[in-house]
Structures are given as C-alpha cells and as structure tokens.
C-alpha cells in the first residue's frame, strides 16, 4: 500500500509584473480559498490559477490520473461537452456559493476555439459588502491533455467621486 502524496496543493508565485498569483492543484482547495478570502474581506483582490483534472475525468479513470486516456482532450467532443457542463453547473455555481452571491449569473461569457485549445471566459460585476468588483473566470482545455486551467481574477471597481 502506497502513501498518498503529501506535497502542498497550493503555492504562491510572483509574475514579472509583480502580481501575486495563488496556484492550486485541486478544486476543493481552490473553493475553500475563495470562501476564506470572502470571509477575510479580501474578495476583491484575488488572483488564482487552478490546474486540475475535472471530477468526471477522474471518475472515468477510477480516480487514477495515470489511467486517463490520451484521447481525453479538447479534440474530444464528449470531453468538451462534459467540461462545459461541469463549468456551468458546478464550478461557477460553487464560486457563486463560496462568494455568497446568489445573484451572480456570469451573463457576459464567450468561447474561443482554436486547434490547440478551447477557452471559455466568464465575466461579471458584483457587489459585496458595499464594494463593487469585477470577477473574471477563464477556463481552458488543451489538445494534448485532460488537465484544465482555470484563472480566477477579481478586480475592484474604482469608486466614482461624487460631484
């Protein structure tokens, strides 16, 4: 019986521009982080990156990433359809719940498809504790892997000075 891998599931990197980005390796840690940031009043300055295998992919491979078929990628229609459903019905819903913003609908959405990848972009302006901020969620799948990249960014909206 082998021991589970005990490496950290979160790391922090600093970009060339000096921005701090939290990088996550699993969905649960990512969602917990978002919930904690909301409780800590840091919800409007968050920059996260999540790289993970979607739950439906792990389920099909019996929770073993080594058993994921090579054909599970952005060229596989079934994978793309299931990923889109996962994003719309689970990931965005979980973000909405973690932020405690039931009115969050992500109506501003787009899809970009190239031979190398598919990208879905979801944007929404929100208000929480009397503070306006923009939420940007970008989900990307690639032609060579079942790994999915999610970028989650919140940016405060500058308050307009009263005349």
From Swiss-Prot:
Pfam families: RGI1 (PF10843). GO terms for cellular component: plasma membrane. It is a peripheral membrane protein. Keywords: Cell membrane, Membrane. One of its GO terms (biological process) is energy reserve metabolic process. Its main location: membrane. It comes from the Eukaryota. It is found in: Cell membrane. Belongs to the RGI1 family. Involved in the control of energetic metabolism and significantly contribute to cell fitness, especially under respiratory growth conditions. This is Respiratory growth induced protein 1. It comes from Lachancea thermotolerans (strain ATCC 56472 / CBS 6340 / NRRL Y-8284) (Yeast).
């Amino acid at each position: 019986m082998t021991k589970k891998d005990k490496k950290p599931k979160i790391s922090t990197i600093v970009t060339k521009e000096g921005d701090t980005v939290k990088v996550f390796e699993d969905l649960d840690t990512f969602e917990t982080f978002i919930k904690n940031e909301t409780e800590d009043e840091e919800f409007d300055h968050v920059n996260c990156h999540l790289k993970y295998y979607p739950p439906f992919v792990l389920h099909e491979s019996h929770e073993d990433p080594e058993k994921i078929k090579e054909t599970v990628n952005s060229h596989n229609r079934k994978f793309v359809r299931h990923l889109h459903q996962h994003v719309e019905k689970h990931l965005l819903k979980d973000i909405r719940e973690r932020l405690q913003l039931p009115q969050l609908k992500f109506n501003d959405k787009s899809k970009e498809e190239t031979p190398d990848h598919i990208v879905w972009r979801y944007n929404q302006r929100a208000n929480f504790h009397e503070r306006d901020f923009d939420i940007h969620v970008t989900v990307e799948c690639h032609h060579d892997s079942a790994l999915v990249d999610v970028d989650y960014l919140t940016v405060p909206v500058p308050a307009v000075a009263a005349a």
